[in-house]
Amino acid sequence: MLATRCKCNLPSRSFVAPARSVRTRALHVEGRFGGGRGGNVIDRPDVDVSKRLGGFDLSDWNIPSWDAKTDNGNNGSNTDKDKKSPPGGGNYRVLLLDSPQHTEKGVVAAITRVVPGTNPDHARNCFATSKQLGMAIITTALKEHAELYREQLFTYRVRTALEPDNSTV
């Protein structure tokens, strides 16, 4: 093995250890609920108890069926079922607001590039309606999509607003 001399102000007998003699040890980290080669179980499996009891018929014992439930943080309440809005945050309207900075060409280009399913005729109609009434509905989308459209239209310097769409049943 070849060792190199240290260039520091130490006695002449000190040498730097060769790179081969350095050993690295890998740390073994175990998960909280096991550490075997297989993955951990996240949810309880669906188990039919009647098959586990040797095939006995439990229907005459009036035992309610067991439903596998996961903890959703609601302390057992069914707040998800009580909601009247569809999943995804509900529908929102993307409104084009009237602004003296808007030009028809710029608004048409922005709307047709950002909002899918729009054409130049629809964009021109939105521009004319916003000039006449002060605002126009560009599209209706889920909240997350509507926020994305608003952010992208903002990059084109188009003033927009969002409002919940309560007209759909």
UniProtKB/Swiss-Prot annotation:
One of its GO terms (biological process) is proteolysis. Its main location: plastid. This is ATP-dependent Clp protease adapter protein CLPS2, chloroplastic. It is found in: Plastid, Chloroplast stroma. One of its GO terms (cellular component) is chloroplast stroma. Small adapter protein that modulate the activity of plastid Clp protease system (CLPC). Probably involved in substrate selection for plastid CLPC. The keyword Chloroplast applies. InterPro entries: ClpS (IPR022935), Ribosomal_bL12_C/ClpS-like (IPR014719). Residues 67-92 are annotated as: Disordered. It comes from the Eukaryota. Keywords: Chloroplast, Plastid, Transit peptide. Residues 1-33 form a transit peptide. It comes from Chlamydomonas reinhardtii (Chlamydomonas smithii). Belongs to the ClpS family.
